[in-house]
């Protein structure tokens, strides 16, 4: 079974049941599926395709869940990375995994900016941070789904 099909199935069959509880947020399957679809469409609009690698450098949070499910729906591959990695190791793992998109937390802005010149496979528009806007990065909350 394709894991990307599970969430839409639950959204159809149990739309009002709670899917996610994260800090003060509670989302139903319908709401969570809509958020995941929005992200999947936005990533597709940025050129992410089936089989592409999407690295995550995120804590356990709503954006991590959304990313995992969106990437699964697209048939792309999640590359989970730790925020504890030093710049050299982070660069090596991103390059060795053939990652083309990075979604990271704001505390990764400086390390990613420092290794940006080494990330040949990651176009600027696919370097995405959650939280407040940072120069040189797309803002996760401002990603636009394709129409």
Regions found by a protein language model. Give the residues of each.
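Structural core segment of the AMP-binding/adenylate-forming
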Residues: 5, 25, 45-46, 73-144
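Conserved AMP-binding/adenylate-forming core of the ANL superfamily
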Residues: 3, 8, 16-61, 65-69, ...
